[in-house]
């Protein structure tokens, strides 16, 4: 979403958007300051449940730090209009929308919580005058077109060589494998892990996606 702001930012402060993720623990405050000192100018408060007091507290802390005054703060993930209004009221500069929409995510099944992404995006876009990031559930150009239509503005990974060909590891953000990798407790697993065939660089895919989006715009009568 922040890519659309590149021209304005490049002209005003002569650098491109550099985004980095932080959590909501005390140690993340030191991380935030270190990231900005290293060149980050957008911070994403990256938690599964963004409509939470800890997220609000982190937004407030970021907004009261002199060293972060020029830094945009994105908050998420959320799925409801009320959550968006809360985070915006505390100063969020952008929102990340999507709970349970990932193809390997099992949150909606295991917890009963979550909203279809298009519905979330449409509802939140009605009250949000900031950039919105659609997170999860974008598999085809049709999915991208729907996300764009309701208000939203490359996933690299290590290549695995096998006797059957090249693959990439694909993991849900709350999968057991991800939790183990990041040293988290092996509990509250709400995702799966798998391998998918390697399809080449994103440049070989993006043209087809762009063609699909352009076709969707023509059907919608866009000018």
For the regions a language model picked out, list residue spans one by one:
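Alpha/beta catalytic cores of nucleotide-metabolism and tRNA/nucleoside-modifying enzymes
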Residues: 83, 89-90, 112-223
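Active-site entrance/lid segments in N-terminal catalytic domains of soluble metabolic enzymes
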Residues: 1-131, 153, 213
């Amino acid at each position: 979403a922040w890519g659309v702001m590149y021209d304005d930012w490049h002209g005003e402060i002569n650098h491109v958007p550099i985004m980095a993720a932080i959590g909501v623990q005390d140690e993340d405050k030191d991380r935030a300051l270190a990231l900005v000192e290293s060149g980050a100018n957008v911070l994403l408060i990256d938690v599964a449940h963004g409509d939470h007091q800890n997220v609000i507290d982190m937004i407030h802390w970021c907004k009261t730090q002199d060293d972060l005054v020029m830094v945009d703060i994105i908050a998420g993930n959320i799925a409801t209009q009320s959550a968006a209004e809360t985070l915006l009221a505390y100063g969020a500069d952008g929102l990340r929308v999507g709970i349970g929409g990932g193809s390997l995510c099992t949150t909606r099944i295991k917890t009963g919580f979550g909203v279809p992404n298009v519905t979330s995006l449409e509802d939140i876009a009605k009250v949000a005058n900031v950039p919105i990031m659609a997170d999860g559930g974008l598999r085809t150009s049709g999915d991208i077109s729907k996300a764009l239509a309701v208000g939203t503005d490359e996933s690299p990974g290590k290549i695995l060589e096998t006797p059957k060909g090249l693959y990439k590891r694909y993991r849900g953000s709350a999968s057991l494998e991800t939790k183990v990798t990041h040293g988290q407790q092996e509990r509250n697993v709400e995702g799966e892990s798998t391998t998918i065939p390697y399809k080449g660089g994103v440049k070989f895919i993006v043209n087809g996606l762009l063609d699909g989006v352009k076709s969707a715009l023509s059907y919608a009568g866009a000018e």
